[in-house]
Amino acid sequence: MHVARLLPLLLLLGQQLRAASVTEPTLPTVVLAILARNAEHSLPHYLGALERLDYPRARLALWCATDHNMDNTTGMLREWLAAVGRDYATVVWKPEEEARSYPDEQGPKHWTKERHQFLMELRQEALAFARDWGADYILFADTDNILTNNQTLKLLIDRQLPVVAPMLDSQTYYSNFWCGITPQGYYRRTAEYFPTKNRQRQGCFRVPMVHSTFLLSLQTEETARLAFYPPHPNYSWPFDDIIVFAYACQAAGVSMHVCNDHRYGYMNVVVKPHQSLEEEKTNFIHLILEALVDGPPMLASAHVSRPPKKLSKMGFDEVFVISLARRPQRRARMLSSLWEMEISAQVVDAVDGRTLNSSILKHLGVDLLPGYQDPYSGHTLTKGEVGCFLSHYSIWEEVVARGLARVVVFEDDVRFKDNFRRRLERLMEDVLIQKLSWDLIYLGRKQVNPEEEVAVEGLPGLVVAGYSYWTLAYTLSLAGARKLLASQPLHRMLPVDEFLPVMFDRHPNDQYKAYFWPRDLQAFSARPLLASPTHYSGDAEWLSDTETSSPWDDDSGRLISQTGSQKALRGPHLHLTGSSGHSLHPHHRDEL
């Protein structure tokens, strides 16, 4: 009896002892080559990503060089190395602090022949160190390439390829690979590029060029012949570091591959030679905002001191953000986005449609506009739409109560366009110069018939607003807020994005308009728009508390829609005639 009980325990103990005796395979050694110039704006996020790589630091070496800086790149790197350098197998630190620019350089983003050569020499020096140290691999990653996937190094090593790059996303169609190259060494467009970039085909693909971030194996005879500098004896292509190395691989019979089977991270779009470091920084901030929406976000290193942000309201009296308390992730993303752009904002807790019932609505004096139906589905007003309207309404009341001359209103699902802050500031400066009388300016909306909208004379960035959907971002004047409140909309409510076109007399339904007078709101819109929704109906991440909700007068909890109306679609689909009686003209594009 006792033996029968003891036997399973002995068997289990034996299994544990055998498991303990099996040691984990030793991971390959890798040199992380860091070559930085004028990278103060991106270094905190770049270094933070390197810190979070899921790889034993004892198997990693740091080879770090910096030169010709006009900012605090050297100081940041020195601070970071002092904090984390001891955790790595070895550290090479090569700062060049004397020269701030190259001869004949027109600006910090101008690539002269001497600059290309110096970069190639540095990469060659890093490669020589890796070989002498006996490393298995060397990873080159530009300092504005942020590897948000902490498995990147392991995933690339597992491919067992001589030169392999993780495909990086950017603000545009730009990435770190070419699918085609001309006989002269220039970029060639191919049919494969966009399906690869858009991940319509996924895997690892052989390409003639990878650059910016790539892993180079040091374990094969072929790669032992590779060099960044000097160029191959037969080289006659342009004197450019990435093209020189692509030719070296071709001459040595070494294949290059790009992998897009995972989301590895992000890269900043390259600025033009005449552009400034400030413009590059602005681009990188937009990249941070895109990562906050699409995920995973970029996280800065805690071991680097960053310049403090100087928050302001951009010349407005207040910046409001409408956000549901039960959507903390959306609120956090929105506040992080505004912080990155140095915008100070006041959070307004949105009225939650889930908390509304008939008695509350009766107490507030809320009643449905007679005859209102959704222009597509024919459904009535939802409690989510009532909550949204009341949230905006509370801001209009605050604007009037505080006498705020002009404000900005954001919902918490805004995707900001590039250079949002400066473009908005410039737009408002132009409006002031032209002495335009305005009540409301859309910054983000869904245009229904954009071809019918008229440009504002003297203001090329502005149009007279036509019938539009969404209220995700707009500016509002004190006079505009007074007009909206004076119409007493709570007693004849419709969705707020239908109400606004009624008030500037551009709604196609005359029956709705008949209940409001005067309809003299002076409404305009930025063109091009400065904001769009983070997601659309049909996207995996799409979430709406207005589209999917209960009927406004139904306390049973029954939902009107599980999929969202056509208003929330990415495509136009605006050619249908809804049961509400107004038809929507078709148009060929959905311009947000």
From Swiss-Prot:
This is Inactive glycosyltransferase 25 family member 3. Glycans are attached at N72, N150, N234, N357. Probable cell adhesion protein involved in leukocyte transmigration across the blood-brain barrier. Does not express any beta-galactosyltransferase activity in vitro. Gene3D superfamilies: Spore Coat Polysaccharide Biosynthesis Protein SpsA, Chain A (3.90.550.10). GO terms for biological process: cell adhesion. Residues 1-19 form the signal peptide. GO terms for cellular component: endoplasmic reticulum lumen. It is found in: Endoplasmic reticulum lumen. Residues 540-592 are annotated as: Disordered. GO terms for molecular function: identical protein binding. A motif (Prevents secretion from ER) lies at residues 589-592. PROSITE patterns: ER_TARGET (PS00014). CDD domains: Glyco_tranf_GTA_type, Glyco_transf_25.
